[in-house]
Amino acid sequence: MASKLLLEIVTPDRKVLSQEVDYVGAPGIEGEFGIMANHIPFLSALGVGNLYFKEGNRTHYIFVSGGFAEVGNNKVTILAEVAEKAVEIDIARAQKAQEKAKARLAKAQDRIESARAQAALQRALARLTCKDAAQKAGTTTH
């Protein structure tokens, strides 16, 4: 039995990652799910949040927003609308986006504006959380 699985993360613009890993945790729209080698095949929609993977005793973090995860034959394929490695996240930009989203939320005139501002706030917070988790884990280079 295989003990590793291949993780591939792809966006419309680029291949973000292709690497053998021990474990993958991802934000599904119904909640987080985890995948290890020899997992049963499945397909899941992705939410906004932090995908993480374990490689030996190190944990790496990648911000993802939207898309799908496909699991099968010891391979996890993430087709994400947005995927950013922790090292690529600009903290100042994410903080600015957070403040802007909070201001938009406070001024929202209807449910649509409110939902858009809430989604922007969720993305900004997830980016900041991703960067923070990677720094705490000492894996900001991935």
Swiss-Prot record:
Give Gene Ontology CC terms: plasma membrane; proton-transporting ATP synthase complex
Where found in the cell? Cell inner membrane
Membrane disposition = Peripheral membrane protein
Look up the domain of life of the source.
Answer: Bacteria
CDD domains for this protein: F1-ATPase_delta (cd12152)
Keywords for this protein: ATP synthesis, Cell inner membrane, Cell membrane, CF(1), Hydrogen ion transport, Ion transport, Membrane, Transport
Stated role: Produces ATP from ADP in the presence of a proton gradient across the membrane.
Q: Which HAMAP family match?
A: ATP_synth_epsil_bac
Complexes and interactors: F-type ATPases have 2 components, CF(1) - the catalytic core - and CF(0) - the membrane proton channel. CF(1) has five subunits: alpha(3), beta(3), gamma(1), delta(1), epsilon(1). CF(0) has three main subunits: a, b and c.
Could you tell me what this protein is called? ATP synthase epsilon chain
Q: Which gene encodes it?
A: atpC
